[in-house]
Structure formats: structure tokens, C-alpha cells
């Protein structure tokens, strides 16, 4: 993989990790179109770039969540967890994120081999699920923005969004798309649904990063320059994608992404079954 290809793949990763169009599908499509196969080291640093992007964008919230978690541990030691939990929205948020991450962790562990086989399969698989992503987005935009935000978020809404994230382990189902849609279905405010979706992505991306990192010692192919440019491209484009989507969801619907998913999904699906791709 040369530097230009690395930058393209990095941009695709950064944009599609956070825009509701499925990073897994687009990485498969992009690598297929460019005729390249990314190395383990490259994948590790792409995930690191995406992780840093979301951590930096929500740094104020992350700092408050870390503080709230430590205070919550103190509450447990002092036998006043319930009192602290209901008095501080960030204490609730950090525990809700932890609990909502459990479904995707279980799916990843229990169905790892089955999911990997889908990623290694024909292009029509991610193309089909990309079309499904478009349908989920379109239907979710027909619902009015709810009133649930940080102040009144409950365990029920958190688990429902966590289940949406678990479904998105399938190639072509957008993680941000399914979680935002799940949030809207269960009554979250549109802007908060997107924000919670992004914060919920942090442990998921971190988990993928750690899983790949454990095999880093087996790497023999290491193109440092390509990895650096891919990492920077994923970081910068990921940050911009988060910023743009949060601005967009305040003013307009996400129908444009639904139409995009339908068009790309149909083109790639037809191209795959007719062996054009």
C-alpha cells in the first residue's frame, strides 16, 4: 500500500466510522476498488486515529465521565452509590455506557468466527446490509425528536441503543446509524441521540483496537510512512465527520445518508451478483 492509498483508506475510515453509512462496508469497497489489503498494523492505527478523534472532540465530557466514575467508586466504598448515582447525570452516563457496551462485547466474543466469515465473503453481503442501513435511517427520520437527554436518560434507553450497536457488528450495518435510529425510536432528543451514539462508540472502538493490538507482535509487513498518513487521515476526517453530523442533525434530517446507502448498496449488490465487481 502506497501513501496515497493509505490516505484514501484513512479518510474512508474516519468519515464512515462516524457518519451513518457503515465503515465496515466502505472499507471493504475501498480496498476492493484500490486492489489493496490493509495490514494488521495499518488497521490498528486506523482505529487509533478514530479513537483519538472522538476522545478529543468530546474531551470535556470524557473528563467529567472519568471524574464521575472515580467518585462513583468512592460512593460504592462508602455505601452511598444509589444516592450519588441519581444526583449526578455524569455518574449515570458512565454506568449506562458501560452497561450498553455489554451487548456488542458479547456478540463479538460469541459470534467472532461467523462475523469474520461475513467480512471475508462476497461484496453483496455488506451491500445488502448497507441498503438495510438506509432503510433504518429513513424510517427513523419519520419520527419526531424526543425529549430524553442527559438529564433524564434511563437504563432502558441506554440498553436499547446498546442493542442497536450490537446489531451493527454485521458488515454494512452502520454503528452510528443503528444507534442514532434506536435512540430516536425510544424517544431521545435528536442531538443527544447522536452525542450518546458517539460516546458509546468509544469502548467499541477501543475494544476493536485492543483485540487487534494483541496480535501486533506477529506483524512482519510494516510500512511506517503509509501507517502514519493513514492514521492522520483517519484522525482528521473522523473529527470533521463528528462535527459535521452534529451540526447537520440539528438543522436537517439524515435522509441524505439513507439515499446514499440505498444507491451505493444497490450498485454494489448488482455489481457483485453479476460479477462486475
From Swiss-Prot:
This enzyme catalyses: di-trans,octa-cis-undecaprenyl diphosphate + H2O = di-trans,octa-cis-undecaprenyl phosphate + phosphate + H(+)
Which Pfam families does the UniProt record give? BacA
GO MF, one example: undecaprenyl-diphosphatase activity
Q: What class of enzyme is it?
A: hydrolase
**What InterPro entries has UniProt attached to this entry?**
UppP
Look up keyword Hydrolase and say if it applies.
Answer: yes
Q: Which residues cross the membrane?
A: 1-21, 38-58, 93-113, 118-138, 168-188, 191-211, 222-242, 256-276
Question: What keywords were assigned to this record?
Answer: Cell membrane, Hydrolase, Membrane, Transmembrane, Transmembrane helix
Task: Kindly list the places in or outside the cell where this protein is found, as annotated in its UniProt entry.
Answer: Cell membrane
Its EC number(s): 3.6.1.27
- What is the recorded membrane topology of this protein? Multi-pass membrane protein
What domain of life does the UniProt record list for this protein's source?
A: Archaea
Q: Name one GO cellular component term.
A: plasma membrane
Q: Does the record bear Metal-binding in its keywords?
A: no
Which family is this protein grouped under? Belongs to the UppP family.
Q: What does this protein do?
A: Catalyzes the dephosphorylation of undecaprenyl diphosphate (UPP).
User: Per its record, how is this protein called by name?
Assistant: Undecaprenyl-diphosphatase
